[in-house]
């Protein structure tokens, strides 16, 4: 080290040295010592002087005081101190650990930006651990909706659920878990009949089942509709339409003629009489039409009334040709 540098180091302790005669290394060392002497220790921190400005790029002092008064003070949720920029949060102390699952920093800002368009009623909580237990039962925040009183909110809740009946035993204010109302399951007999009806329906047989009414319970069951008549959907259905025929038999057949279980014969003589009567009776004379029932559902240009009118006109025309032109048909 040169004599100039030695004299410069001696001048540091005595007073403000003259940096013109120093070397570059000595000037750097001198500046570091001055910065360490200016920096306050953590135990006894002195307030900043009035003339000091630009701590970490922010003005501190008279200018900053004017800005805080103009801008409305420290931003909410941010505790500031000297040497830290305005609006920056202080990290937690060394002794305390942050709880697991707490979203902080840029991730919290990102979730808040994603939930910007969601209603606060439907928005899930970002940090469940940060929510105080006492504030969960509050319906609304007083700062966001000060115009809704607690009595009005209770009235709104009552209007929102008018169908709920209060239980006399439990009381008005007691809470109970949500109970889903389900229909009671049908009895085994009904299920068996339904399976049998489906089995017979697939084979083209008519089935008409009456579902028995279940016993009255506390919950009123839904109305059960009886099963419809099920007919075969084959395309070979024949529809017989009877047109006015004075010679046809108008009296209906007795029930014993179409019953599946006729009464047992008592003697041989009445049986012969019944056989002779059955031979004498003739079936009603009608006009059998080969008619497909499935055509009704298909879009056709001709309706049933037009079809039957054409058949009637043909019958009248044949009658006129046989008897002469004595009748005039009026459509």
Curated annotation (Swiss-Prot):
Pfam families, per database record: FYTT
Annotated keywords: mRNA transport, Nucleus, RNA-binding, Transport
Principal cellular location given in the protein's record: nucleus
Origin: domain of life: Eukaryota
Region (Disordered): 30-51, 63-99, 158-193
A Gene Ontology biological process term: mRNA export from nucleus
Molecular function in Gene Ontology: mRNA binding
Compartments, record wording: Nucleus, Nucleoplasm; Nucleus speckle
Disulfide bond annotation, renumbered to this chain: none
GO CC term (a single one): nuclear speck
Motif residue range(s): UAP56-binding motif: 16-34
Polar residues composition-biased segments: 166-175
Keyword Nucleus among record annotations: yes
UniProt record similarity statement: Belongs to the UIF family.
UniProt function note: Required for mRNA export from the nucleus to the cytoplasm. Acts as an adapter that uses the ddx39b/uap56-nfx1 pathway to ensure efficient mRNA export and delivering to the nuclear pore.
Protein name per Swiss-Prot or TrEMBL: UAP56-interacting factor
Species, as recorded: Salmo salar
């Amino acid at each position: 080290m040169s004599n100039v540098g030695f004299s410069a180091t001696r001048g540091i302790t005595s007073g403000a040295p003259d940096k013109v005669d120093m070397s570059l290394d000595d000037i750097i060392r001198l500046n570091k010592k001055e910065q360490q002497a200016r920096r306050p220790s953590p135990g006894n921190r002195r307030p900043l002087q009035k003339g000091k400005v630009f701590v970490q790029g922010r003005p501190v002092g008279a200018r900053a005081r004017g800005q805080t008064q103009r801008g409305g003070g420290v931003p909410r949720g941010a505790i500031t101190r000297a040497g830290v920029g305005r609006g920056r949060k202080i990290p937690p102390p060394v002794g305390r650990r942050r709880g697991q699952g707490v979203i902080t920093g840029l991730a919290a800002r990102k979730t808040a930006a994603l939930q910007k368009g969601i209603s606060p009623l439907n928005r899930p909580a970002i940090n469940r651990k940060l929510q105080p237990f006492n504030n969960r039962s509050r319906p609304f925040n007083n700062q966001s909706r000060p115009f809704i009183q607690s009595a009005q909110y209770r009235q709104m809740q009552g209007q929102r659920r008018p169908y709920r009946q209060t239980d006399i035993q439990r009381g008005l204010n007691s809470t109970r878990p949500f109970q889903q109302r389900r229909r009671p399951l049908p009895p085994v007999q009904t299920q068996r009949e339904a399976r049998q009806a489906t089995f017979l329906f697939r084979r083209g047989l008519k089935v008409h089942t009456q579902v028995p009414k279940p016993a009255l319970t506390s919950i009123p069951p839904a109305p059960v509709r009886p099963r419809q008549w099920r007919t075969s959907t084959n395309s070979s259905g024949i529809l017989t339409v009877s047109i006015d025929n004075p010679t046809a038999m108008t009296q209906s057949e007795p029930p014993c003629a179409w019953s599946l279980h006729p009464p047992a014969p008592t003697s041989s003589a009445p049986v012969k009489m019944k056989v002779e009567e059955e031979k004498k009776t003739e079936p009603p004379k009608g006009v059998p039409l080969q008619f497909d029932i499935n055509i009704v559902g298909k879009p056709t240009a001709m309706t049933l009334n037009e079809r039957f009118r054409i058949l009637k006109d043909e019958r009248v025309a044949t009658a006129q040709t046989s008897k002469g032109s004595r009748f005039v048909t009026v459509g």
